[in-house]
């Protein structure tokens, strides 16, 4: 991934600089997340933008038709620039890197919490407070996932730290201690 980061980082930093100059940070972060979700949920779109067969002008036309009413002009121009520079194929990596740099600069930790069932807002709030203390950041961006195999409880990961408070893990530990 370091090689890809060496390509994506300058573009991500340039986008962040434009955003900061125009005081559009929160709006842009929201649009970037929506754009990533749209591309990740549309393999056809990702394939079209990544296609070496499709001409740059055709890609820019697709970008304009799909995104002109969904994103602000700065982001639209950025997408067209990536098409011109033959970098639109790594758009998701560039946008992911943009979000990483934004979080680093804003002291926001990204946490993934996997639970057996959907968490209530109260549970999310309690988990968020605990993770903020562990991560040592001011803010936290929480991504939740559901995995019924956990049986109960949750598994949270922030960076390289993992908190396994799942029932499946406790049962596994109990089984190991009984087998000794």
From Swiss-Prot:
Q: How does it sit in the membrane?
A: Peripheral membrane protein
Superkingdom per UniProt:
Bacteria
InterPro entries, per the entry: ATP_synth_OSCP/delta_N_sf, ATPase_OSCP/dsu
Q: Which UniProt keywords apply?
A: ATP synthesis, CF(1), Hydrogen ion transport, Ion transport, Membrane, Thylakoid, Transport
Q: One Pfam match, by short name?
A: OSCP
- Does the UniProt entry include the keyword Hydrolase? no
Note the SUPFAM superfamilies from the entry. Answer: N-terminal domain of the delta subunit of the F1F0-ATP synthase
Any one Gene Ontology cellular component term annotated for this protein: plasma membrane-derived thylakoid membrane
Q: Does the keyword Transport apply?
A: yes
Protein localization: Cellular thylakoid membrane
Query: What are the protein's GO molecular function terms?
Result: proton-transporting ATP synthase activity, rotational mechanism
Function, as annotated, reads: F(1)F(0) ATP synthase produces ATP from ADP in the presence of a proton or sodium gradient. F-type ATPases consist of two structural domains, F(1) containing the extramembraneous catalytic core and F(0) containing the membrane proton channel, linked together by a central stalk and a peripheral stalk. During catalysis, ATP synthesis in the catalytic domain of F(1) is coupled via a rotary mechanism of the central stalk subunits to proton translocation.
**Annotated family:** Belongs to the ATPase delta chain family.
Q: Which PANTHER family does UniProt cross-reference here?
A: ATP SYNTHASE DELTA CHAIN (PTHR11910)
HAMAP family, A to Z: ATP_synth_delta_bact
How it assembles, according to the record, is: F-type ATPases have 2 components, F(1) - the catalytic core - and F(0) - the membrane proton channel. F(1) has five subunits: alpha(3), beta(3), gamma(1), delta(1), epsilon(1). CF(0) has four main subunits: a(1), b(1), b'(1) and c(10-14). The alpha and beta chains form an alternating ring which encloses part of the gamma chain. F(1) is attached to F(0) by a central stalk formed by the gamma and epsilon chains, while a peripheral stalk is formed by the delta, b and b' chains.
Identify the NCBIfam families for this entry. Answer: ATP_synt_delta
The name of this protein is ATP synthase subunit delta
Protein's organism: Prochlorococcus marinus (strain MIT 9301)
